């Protein structure tokens, strides 16, 4: 009983400090699960909305906020298979509000910015320059937004688009204020801050040992350190890849299968940098199934992991993305250590020549 009261007091202290230091940016994780079902948007988007509408201890306010978030998603979220239906409604009504991932590019020939809608399938939509100036993440991979669209077809402007962006509002953190984060961190002890970090990724620290807490925090290192390479092997369905797919908008999870040097590092035809130049962290799920179509793919990956750079053609390129390899093991660690090797399934990646001889 005493331990329970101590735990509750500790939670109350942390919650109060969070409200004082990060008001409007904290959210109950159990609410995310209620809304996630049926909404195909990343967890960090749901949490941003919940932080806006449910930042209260009053059950009635929280319930109203959850209903508001559900209504917003139901009314405005664009599913790719309903894109034409949404465009038809936009044409009929003259205006419509959508939730979609927006990427902005600068059209150098015409000297203005253009927006691209991921699910709606729209490209080359003019957008006011105030938005990329204010939310620079629009230019670097895109962000999820609520967008108010107008539709006005003009006969004399047949070459233009009838669709215009009236207002754009990000529904994920468009940027991180490091100074604010550092200032707020000063109010917490090390143990309290560890608990905050773990709860931020959906883990309950009160059920974990001190060692388990540190192991889970190690998972986060590739998200904040440049060129930090990590391999995690464990039983199936234990949440190893969840962190890299759902928690951060700056990481990408590549499902196991074939990949190419052009996709991962550099496309010599288009002169564009691949995933390592676009994301803070590139994670590979089911790493045992990864295969490169290019013969030199594994060697280029090794060079990049060792030095943070790679050579393609006549140029050497540098990037800062960390790499994470997530894989499954089908036996207990104790049994594997006695009878085999934890990394046996990765031989074809690390030593392709030797693997061919073994086969």
Sequence positions of predicted segments:
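Short acidic (Asp/Glu) and glycine-rich catalytic loops that position anionic groups and cofactors
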Residues: 173-176, 279-284, 350
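Extended, charged/polar low-complexity intrinsically disordered regions
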Residues: 2-200
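A generic structural micro-environment signature
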Residues: 123, 155, 203, 207, ...
């Amino acid at each position: 009983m005493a331990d329970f009261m101590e735990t509750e007091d500790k939670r109350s202290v942390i919650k109060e400090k969070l409200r004082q230091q990060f008001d409007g940016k904290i959210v109950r994780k159990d609410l995310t699960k209620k809304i996630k079902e049926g909404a195909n948007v990343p967890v960090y988007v749901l949490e941003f909305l919940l932080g806006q509408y449910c930042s209260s201890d009053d059950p009635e306010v929280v319930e109203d906020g959850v209903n508001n978030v559900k209504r917003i998603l139901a009314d405005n979220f664009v599913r790719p298979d309903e894109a034409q239906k949404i465009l038809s409604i936009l044409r009929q009504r003259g205006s419509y509000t959508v939730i979609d991932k927006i990427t902005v590019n600068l059209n150098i020939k015409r000297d203005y910015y253009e927006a691209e809608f991921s699910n709606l399938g729209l490209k080359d939509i003019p957008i006011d320059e105030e938005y990329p100036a204010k939310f620079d993440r629009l230019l670097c991979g895109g962000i999820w937004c609520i967008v108010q669209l107008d539709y006005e077809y003009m006969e004399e402007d047949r070459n233009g688009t009838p669709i215009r962006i009236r207002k754009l509002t990000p529904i994920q953190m468009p940027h991180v204020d490091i100074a604010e984060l550092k200032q707020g961190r000063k109010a917490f002890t090390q143990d309290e801050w560890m608990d905050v970090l773990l709860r931020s990724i959906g883990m309950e620290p009160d059920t974990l040992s001190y060692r388990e807490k540190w192991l889970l925090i190690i998972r986060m290192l590739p998200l904040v350190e440049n060129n930090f390479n990590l391999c995690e092997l464990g039983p199936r369905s234990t949440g190893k890849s969840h962190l890299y797919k759902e928690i951060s908008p700056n990481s990408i999870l590549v499902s196991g299968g074939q990949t190419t040097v052009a996709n991962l590092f550099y496309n010599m035809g288009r002169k564009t940098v691949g995933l390592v130049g676009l994301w803070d962290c590139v994670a590979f799920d089911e790493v045992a199934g990864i295969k490169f179509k290019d013969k030199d793919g594994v060697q280029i990956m090794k060079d990049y992991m060792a030095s943070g750079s790679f050579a393609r053609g006549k140029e050497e390129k540098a990037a800062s993305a960390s790499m994470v390899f997530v894989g499954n093991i089908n036996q207990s660690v104790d049994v594997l250590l006695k009878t085999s090797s934890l990394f046996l399934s990765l031989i074809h990646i690390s030593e392709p020549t030797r693997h061919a001889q073994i086969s």
